[in-house]
């Protein structure tokens, strides 16, 4: 609709959903990036709570009044944030950061379909894409009865959702792809749908998973560590206000998919880190503020 309006007028002012400004939502990523790179496009006003403008309406990610002028150059937005303070913090953090935590984020575990169908061909009807999708989907505990409540020898404990509740089930390791990136490692698992997208919102109930523990599409896994101590350090980082602020650069809906973690800097979670992970989360926040040379005003904004 926006593209069509730009074809028929030099100057276009619109009010519309804002999720694409954060490279989120259902619009194609290529289109999002095109809009954010358009020097003729700018934001006049942004409102995170759409119900303030459209009563009794919930528009995830808020709404924006945008202006496009083919005859003027405003400069590309590139990265849009709700707050000018957050954009300044992002610029400062990424002036010295080179790696994002998204590099250690992994999607759900997978079946070994060859082994599964050899012994249980009837399971093919419960697998997506006509039996070709090997991933542990959200409803897999219902679709595949091989996930059991009781643990048996060589079974893999799997975290998922059953009847709307977080649940652990067990499946024989023979039916699982054991080459998944973090199956044999320590990791932190969090719900894929988490909160509402409000700034700095606490991420609900992250848990540490041990080696040979898995998770369904209802969750994402962060890390692939050799030691539990590293996973514990990551868990503290996830609970920090600093991380939650950096996550808010792109997280404006409930989804915590890999892409929204782009501006969260990766840390060294070992004992050799420049952060002392043995400290409390409050003290870890202070260390992170010092590491990135944040001002008193920037710290107050995050806090």
Where on the chain are the PLM-derived regions?
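Conserved Class I SAM-dependent methyltransferase catalytic core
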Residues: 1-52, 64-68, 234
């Amino acid at each position: 609709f926006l593209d069509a309006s730009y074809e028929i007028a030099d100057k276009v002012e619109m009010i519309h959903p804002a999720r694409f400004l954060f490279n989120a939502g259902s619009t194609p990523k290529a289109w999002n990036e095109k809009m954010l790179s358009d020097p003729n496009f700018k934001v006049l006003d942004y409102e995170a709570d759409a119900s303030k403008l459209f009563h009794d309406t919930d528009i995830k990610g808020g709404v924006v009044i945008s202006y496009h002028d083919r005859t003027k150059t405003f400069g590309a937005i590139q990265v849009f944030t709700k707050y000018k303070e957050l954009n300044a913090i992002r610029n400062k953090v990424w002036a010295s950061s080179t790696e994002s935590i998204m590099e250690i984020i992994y999607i759900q575990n997978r079946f070994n379909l060859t082994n599964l169908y050899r012994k249980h061909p009837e399971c093919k009807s419960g697998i997506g894409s006509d039996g070709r999708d090997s991933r542990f989907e959200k409803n897999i505990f219902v679709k595949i009865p091989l996930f059991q409540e009781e643990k048996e020898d060589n079974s893999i404990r799997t975290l998922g959702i059953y009847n709307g509740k977080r649940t652990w089930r067990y499946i024989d390791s023979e039916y699982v792809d054991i080459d998944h990136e973090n199956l044999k490692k320590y990791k932190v698992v969090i719900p894929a749908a988490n909160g509402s997208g409000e700034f700095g919102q606490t991420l609900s109930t992250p848990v540490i998973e041990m080696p040979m523990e898995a998770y369904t599409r209802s969750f994402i896994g962060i890390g692939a560590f050799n030691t539990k101590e590293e996973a514990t350090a990551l868990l503290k980082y996830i609970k920090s206000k600093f991380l939650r602020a950096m996550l808010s650069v792109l997280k404006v809906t409930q989804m915590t998919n890999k892409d929204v973690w782009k501006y969260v800097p990766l840390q060294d979670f070992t004992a050799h880190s420049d952060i002392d992970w043995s400290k409390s989360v409050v003290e870890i926040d202070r260390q992170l503020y010092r590491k990135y040379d944040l001002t008193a005003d920037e710290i107050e904004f995050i806090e």
